[in-house]
């Protein structure tokens, strides 16, 4: 009599794909190297517990710990075959996951892990690191505000000042969008002081100079620009009018209106391979200096006055205030006189400007 085979039925979904990708990134090994555990720890290592837990979060779209253990229990064979590890349900109890979270909350070890992961990923995938985008966002929630907690009342980007929020600052490879550094801070914190530590971590992890850091107007503080310039890197950001010398904006615009400046066209390559005019403007230079770590740093800011081309191909972004500018060490300004009581409109042309420069 033929023996009846033992058939295992499990829902696979995208789990093998997620786990394979994380293994190629070296995630389990890097986590184990940077977050050592107590000698009495048994079962799966912290790195593998974290990796499988992350695959659960990504596959289910749910970060709650209470659902992880039963999720694993229904996929023991799939997880074991995919990872090559002896996966057990007891490796994912709430107590075990809480220990993992406490270990991962060590800021010093996390910074070292983040740096090692960036270096490994950039090297393995031969990623371009020419441009880094730095920006912050906030997330509101129906949470309880506690002293020293992450959720605090602050300036709400969600237009919900009645809700506490948490703030996230992140630096990503542009245009890929791969995170390089992430900081989660309490919601009442201002954006301006968050740029320097985030950029410094990216510089330490990549170990390269000559990168272009792209940010919004809150990255335009002179301290932030001085640190980037002193490090041998470059920046592209809107420069608020308060950062300009008195009369500089008016003089720069008047030079255009009087016809004293020749405007240079800026083109962008379309998906069909054709070039389209997206803006025109001119450049001038301004000597800059600022004290950084006790030493006076000097650099030359290349400032661009730019008028966006009026065409349906552009997607303008409304601005409430107005004229602002961009600096790469460079500034982009509107060249037209804005109509009275109407917002100034902007279009971002960083890649095209880089090619032009």
Report residues per predicted region:
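Anion-binding and metal-coordination hotspots
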Residues: 1-20, 25-357
């Amino acid at each position: 009599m033929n023996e009846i085979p033992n058939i295992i039925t499990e829902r696979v979904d995208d789990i093998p794909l997620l786990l394979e990708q994380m293994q190629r990134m070296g995630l389990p090994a890097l986590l184990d190297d940077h977050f050592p555990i107590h000698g009495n720890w048994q079962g799966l290592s912290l790195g593998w517990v974290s990796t499988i837990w992350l695959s659960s979060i990504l596959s289910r779209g749910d970060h709650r710990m209470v659902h992880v253990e039963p999720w694993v229990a229904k996929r023991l064979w799939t997880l074991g075959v995919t990872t090559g590890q002896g996966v057990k349900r007891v490796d994912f109890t709430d107590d075990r996951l809480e220990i993992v979270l406490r270990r991962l909350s060590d800021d010093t070890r996390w910074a070292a892990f983040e740096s090692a992961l960036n270096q490994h990923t950039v090297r393995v995938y031969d990623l371009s690191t020419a441009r880094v985008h730095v920006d912050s966002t906030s997330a509101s929630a129906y949470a309880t505000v506690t002293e020293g907690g992450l959720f605090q009342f602050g300036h709400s980007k969600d237009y919900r000042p009645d809700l506490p929020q948490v703030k996230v600052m992140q630096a990503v490879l542009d245009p890929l969008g791969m995170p390089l550094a992430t900081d989660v801070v309490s919601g009442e914190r201002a954006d301006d002081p968050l740029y320097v530590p985030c950029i410094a971590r990216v510089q330490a992890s990549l170990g390269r100079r000559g990168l272009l850091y792209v940010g919004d107007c809150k990255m335009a503080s002179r301290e932030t620009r001085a640190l980037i310039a002193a490090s041998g890197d470059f920046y592209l950001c809107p420069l608020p009018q308060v950062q300009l010398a008195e009369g500089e904006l008016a003089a720069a615009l008047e030079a255009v209106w009087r016809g004293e400046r020749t405007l240079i066209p800026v083109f962008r390559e379309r998906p069909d391979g054709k070039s389209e005019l997206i803006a025109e403007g001119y450049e001038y230079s301004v000597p800059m200096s600022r004290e950084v770590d006790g030493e006076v740093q000097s650099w030359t800011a290349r400032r661009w006055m730019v008028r966006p081309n009026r065409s349906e191909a552009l997607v303008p972004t409304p601005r409430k205030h107005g004229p602002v500018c961009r600096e790469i060490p460079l500034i982009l300004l509107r060249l037209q006189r804005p109509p009275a009581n109407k917002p100034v409109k902007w279009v971002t042309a960083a890649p095209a400007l880089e090619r032009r420069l």
